């Protein structure tokens, strides 16, 4: 559905919301009719976030531990600066999201969910474990990596920047982040936690 959304200048989240009958957004069956009028246009056209410049291969992801200082507010602001995005709406949403995902710990690793499988990496944990302050899996981190950020998944600025690019692509969050809490429940302090 992402290609259809882009072709019709509609956010993916809006297209999915307008088509609850579609059970697998990666597979549209012949004869299946989509509702294109129920969606809302993605601000600025079909691309709702930065270009994919910066994506890296899975083999380029590194697994060092973060030893610097800072907090989620500062890291999110830096991610916004790197991506040339206004931080006003992103910071509050990511304070909530990161508190729920990792308690704000840039070295957090989830070894107990369904992603925790694959070959052991240099940090001693399976490849697909969620890692870092925004709990990115390496697949998501590498495909949404932002140029000019670290390739280390534990670097909080790089982790948050990749997560921001992911939510813009996956959920259609606008580049100014004004709709982050609406489209990503995990970033909304007024709704219960929900994975993203």
Q: What are these language model-derived features?
A:
Residues 36-65:
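Intrinsically disordered, low-complexity Ser/Thr-rich linker and spacer segments
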Residues 3-46:
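Extracellular LysM carbohydrate-binding repeats and other cell-envelope/extracellular binding modules
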Residues 12, 16-26, 57-196:
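Peptidoglycan cell-wall recognition and remodeling modules
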């Amino acid at each position: 559905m992402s290609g259809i959304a882009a072709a019709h200048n509609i956010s993916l989240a809006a297209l999915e919301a307008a088509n609850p009958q579609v059970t697998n957004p990666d597979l549209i069956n012949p004869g299946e009719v989509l509702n294109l009028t129920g969606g809302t246009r993605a601000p600025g056209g079909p691309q709702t976030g930065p270009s994919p410049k910066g994506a890296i291969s899975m083999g380029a992801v590194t697994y060092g531990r973060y030893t610097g200082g800072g907090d989620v507010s500062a890291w999110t602001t830096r991610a916004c600066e790197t991506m040339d995005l206004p931080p006003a709406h992103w910071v509050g949403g990511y304070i909530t999201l990161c508190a729920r995902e990792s308690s704000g710990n840039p070295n957090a690793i989830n070894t107990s969910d369904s992603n925790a499988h694959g070959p052991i990496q240099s940090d001693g944990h399976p490849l697909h474990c969620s890692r870092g302050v925004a709990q990115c899996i390496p697949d998501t981190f590498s495909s949404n990596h932002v140029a000019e950020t670290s390739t280390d998944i534990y670097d909080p600025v790089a982790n948050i920047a990749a997560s921001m690019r992911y939510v813009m692509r996956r959920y259609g969050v606008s580049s100014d982040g004004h709709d982050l809490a609406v489209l990503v429940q995990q970033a909304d302090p007024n709704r219960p936690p929900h994975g993203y």
